[in-house]
Amino acid sequence: MPTITSYFGFLLAALTITSALFIGLSKIGLI
């Protein structure tokens, strides 16, 4: 099922980007 696969792929990408932004902000010291 390509729809479910693409959905999980998008979800994984969004989670990765969110984690990267959170880590970046933490290193800068805003959080």
Swiss-Prot record:
Role noted for this protein: Component of the cytochrome b6-f complex, which mediates electron transfer between photosystem II (PSII) and photosystem I (PSI), cyclic electron flow around PSI, and state transitions. PetL is important for photoautotrophic growth as well as for electron transfer efficiency and stability of the cytochrome b6-f complex.
Gene that codes for this? petL
This protein is called Cytochrome b6-f complex subunit 6
Membrane topology for this entry?
Single-pass membrane protein
Q: Does the keyword Electron transport apply?
A: yes
InterPro entries given in the database record: Cyt_b6/f_cplx_su6
Task: Tell me where the transmembrane regions lie.
Answer: 4-24
Relate the assembly described in the record.
The 4 large subunits of the cytochrome b6-f complex are cytochrome b6, subunit IV (17 kDa polypeptide, PetD), cytochrome f and the Rieske protein, while the 4 small subunits are PetG, PetL, PetM and PetN. The complex functions as a dimer.
The question of whether Aminoacyl-tRNA synthetase is a record keyword is answered with no
State the family named in the UniProt similarity comment for this chain. Answer: Belongs to the PetL family.
Question: Mind telling me which GO cellular component terms the entry cites?
Answer: chloroplast thylakoid membrane; cytochrome b6f complex
Write down the species.
Citrus sinensis (Sweet orange)
One Pfam family per UniProt? PetL
The subcellular location is: Plastid, Chloroplast thylakoid membrane
| GO terms of biological process kind | photosynthesis
Q: Name one GO molecular function term.
A: electron transporter, transferring electrons within cytochrome b6/f complex of photosystem II activity
Question: Keywords for this entry?
Answer: Chloroplast, Electron transport, Membrane, Photosynthesis, Plastid, Thylakoid, Transmembrane, Transmembrane helix, Transport
